[in-house]
Amino acid sequence: MVSMNSEIWKPAPFSPSFTDREIGPFFEMRMYTFEPEQIDKILGPWEQKLEARNNLAPLVGAFISEIGDVNKFMHIWGYKSLQHRTEAREKFSSIGWPPKSDAKPPLKMENKIVMAANFSPIK
């Protein structure tokens, strides 16, 4: 083994519970790395815009890294198709997404399109 990384994440205050839901099968996972003390600045604006954003595609979960690589914020959204994702993204500016905040811009962004495992309660 050349490298290994372990992380523990806690749900953001507005993150929904992990319950059985059929909101996929495509999921977009985004992870942002911020400077220290910036993540708390985005949480309020995110929570305020969440209902409008959920109308475009449901939030699977939002998480803050607690152990390992810290100062990271991850959010996962469900899409019925890749076309659904494209259509939702085209409407983001009309709802003010992403929300404006006093946080400094992220230092790094990672984006992945994934599909649920067979055993996942969220499909």
Could you tell me what each predicted segment is?
Residues 33-43:
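Short, surface-exposed ligand-recognition loops at beta-strand->loop->(often short) alpha-helix junctions
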Residues 33, 76-78:
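Short hydrophobic/aromatic beta-strand micro-patches
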Residues 66:
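Conserved beta-strand-loop-alpha-helix junction that forms the acyl-donor binding cleft
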Residues 17, 35-37, 83:
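A short, structured loop/turn motif at beta-sheet edges
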Residues 16-23, 115-123:
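Short, low-order "capping/linker" segments at domain edges
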Residues 1-31:
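Surface-exposed beta-loop interaction hotspot
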Residues 1-9, 45-60, 69, 78-117:
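An amphipathic, aromatic/His-enriched active-site/gating alpha helix that lines ligand/cofactor pockets
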